Amino acid sequence: MSHLRKLRAAAPSVREVALWSRQSPYSRSFSSHNRPSPKYPHHVPLGFFEKGFLAVGSAVGALLNPRRADLIATLGEVTATPYFIYRLRDAMLQDPTGRQILRDRPRITSQTLPLPYLRSLPENSVGRTYATWLDREGVSPDTRDNVQYIDDPECAYVMQRYRECHDFYHAVTGLPTFVEGELALKAFEFLNTLIPMTGLSMAASVRLKPAERERLFSLYLPWAVRSGLNSKELINVYWEKILEKDVDELRAELGIEKPPDMRDIRRMIRLQQKREREQQQGKSS
């Protein structure tokens, strides 16, 4: 266990990985004189080899510590081009709601979606479900990193939109934020969005306990395949405009099957293990 903790602590930061990629003799796509100017706030232009080094470094770091959201975000950006993020953008352009989102470019934060308002909505509404999930998991919409490594400004917004809508996907499916829940959701997202990072995240299943891994592949992966292949493109959901909609009705419209409650399953397993220990102690005494 101490070795694992040391490896997790050694996981590089995004800044360190980016600096390493720029300093490598194989990554000099741009010199200090010809590096393009940023195309939008926070944009960091990188060459092909620089993105390759950044992809490898962030992938290794995220595998060592699956809770490093910054590394996962970086991996998502540098592996989304040249094809996948454009495919997602084109899916939005082909949909009326998607086109409206691209025109409006809304952002999901605690200012644009105040939690007190969301908590005041009807109990089974989308907004109330989202707020309840945020409260239960102890997370905030303000923690999402800004996109940096996608060159096209419109595609950068598409990635930002996907990133900020991720918690809505959690809320609608009911999946929690611990690693097992994140992997189940990532498998669903991969089949819905085709963003490579979501599929690559499944490598983190090696970090699960055997029982968790067996449950992921036997119960939640089949759910992810069914819902991911049959559901509509979630990137085209204008969440801000359907906050009062019934969440069960939304799931039916989108073609999303609600998975078994992961927290309830884990709670029942813990209770069963506790009873078994108590029975063993009773026999031994």
Curated annotation (Swiss-Prot):
It holds the Pfam family Coq4. Residues 1-37 form a transit peptide. Coiled coil: none annotated. The keyword Metal-binding applies. Its EC number is 4.1.1.130. InterPro entries: Coq4, Coq4_euk. Zn(2+) binds at H166, D167, H170, E182. It catalyses: a 4-hydroxy-3-methoxy-5-(all-trans-polyprenyl)benzoate + H(+) = a 2-methoxy-6-(all-trans-polyprenyl)phenol + CO2. Keywords: Lyase, Membrane, Metal-binding, Mitochondrion, Mitochondrion inner membrane, Transit peptide, Ubiquinone biosynthesis, Zinc. It is a peripheral membrane protein. Its main location: mitochondrion. It is found in: Mitochondrion inner membrane. Pathway: Cofactor biosynthesis; ubiquinone biosynthesis. GO terms for biological process: ubiquinone biosynthetic process. GO terms for cellular component: extrinsic component of mitochondrial inner membrane; mitochondrion. Lyase that catalyzes the C1-decarboxylation of 4-hydroxy-3-methoxy-5-(all-trans-polyprenyl)benzoic acid into 2-methoxy-6-(all-trans-polyprenyl)phenol during ubiquinone biosynthesis. HAMAP family: Coq4. Component of a multi-subunit COQ enzyme complex, composed of at least coq3, coq4, coq5, coq6, coq7 and coq9. Belongs to the COQ4 family. This is Ubiquinone biosynthesis protein coq4, mitochondrial. It comes from Emericella nidulans (strain FGSC A4 / ATCC 38163 / CBS 112.46 / NRRL 194 / M139) (Aspergillus nidulans). The gene is coq4.
